[in-house]
Amino acid sequence: GYEKPDFITINRFRNRVKDEINDIFTQIVLLLCARGFVSLDVEYVDGTKIESKANKYTFVWRKTVERNRAKLLEKIKALLEQVDEAIAQDKCNVDERMEFTPTQLSEMSAELNTALSSLSVTTDKKEKERRKKLQKTAKELEKHSKKLSEYNQHLDTLGERNSYSKTDKDATFMRMKEDAMNNGQTKPGYNLQIGTEGQFITDFALFPNPTDTLTYIPFMESFKNRYEALPSTEIADSGYGSEENYRFLEEHGIEAFVKYNRFHIEQRPRYVQDPFRSENFYYNEKEDYCVCPMGQHMNRIGQRRVKTESGYISERHRYQAQNCNGCPLRPLCFKATGNRIIERNQICLYSAAIY
């Protein structure tokens, strides 16, 4: 008696019935809604980082895997050039860049070993050296096959993430809010997003992405999947302020109280508005031009599209000054050659003006 289940047993139980636990949570919130404790029309969103118990030195980085995998493919290509011409031509064209699979490499190695074993015994010294070299090539092909399989497995585990921990493959390396050393060290963890109303948690979700900005829309969609509707009012801090999120809220008719990302910086007592920042330039909406601190008109010269990490396309209008030569404010304004060019994101500037 008095035996306690260890953490592995508890974790296995949670993994086995996680769908049922999620359904029970939803039913409890719906019961609170039926009793009038929450309305599900208002949601306060915030996030926090939860550190994993995984070892912080068990990281796997996407860039490292992709770089080493590319080097390995080059080694394989060079190695195949040494293989018997008939086998090389049968399996691949070494003059063309192609993707090899671990299975292909294992088959090449096996075929090469079979071809070597079928040869008759020879006493020719040069022929012996050639066969010995081919045997070595076959072993290296098999070795490269295993390594390529390992890299492919890393990429499959990574998915769309940039890192993961070997001892907790669901954890992603990210900077935590509590940084005792103050050196920005990344640790394995999770980005937990929580929605509340009336001090009750109404929704939650874990994300591998450390940036709150990129988790907001998926979190809103999880709310809709759970309750078959979106809240009519959203409240969130400046970590969620982005053009993509503002557009999402506007398109779905949601009343938003989401601060733009520079809101808290501008509220500091010592904050002084920089007149040379492009967003502080006077803008004539009717005639579509900006005015620099020197009073010179900056006419629109086109627009540029920027693709964000989430795939969202942001359009930015570009404006150029007519003549910056000899301007006494130029050293404070910009350091590039030619006339200054600025970009304006109309949606973000509109949101900043509201708040």
Where are these regions (language model features)?
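Anion-binding and metal-coordination hotspots
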Residues: E3-Y355
